[in-house]
Amino acid sequence: TRVSGGDTVWVRPDDAPRRKPVKLRLVGIDAPERCQPWGAEATAALSERVLHRRVEVPTQGVDAHGRVLGGLFLADGSDVAAWMVAQGHAWSPRWQHRPGPYEREQREAQARRLGLFADPAALEPWRFRRAHGPCE
């Protein structure tokens, strides 16, 4: 695995070790962009959690940017996306007026003021992208 952001990793399938790694976008979370405050912390946290570890990747399709969409689970079954939100490294955004899949983890992290939830100026990535565009 290789991490390129707080919600994006490159994974290599076990069944095809010679194949190129696949870019995976974690479903259900949105981490700060690399160029925005908290972006480096989110990327480092995800790296520390998954780098050089065997992971399970249930996929859900491909997004408009060509990234595979899916979950990311460690060998012990723990959900990496849930952990990222619970530790205050990512948001679980609402979708079509429905709560995000990790709403409970986000509420708890906010209540405990963990990570980016301790910063009253922390800006959700979708608002950052709307205001500033993507990182170069």
Q: What residue spans do the PLM features occupy?
A:
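Small beta-barrel nucleic-acid-binding modules, primarily SNase/OB-fold domains
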Residues: 1-136
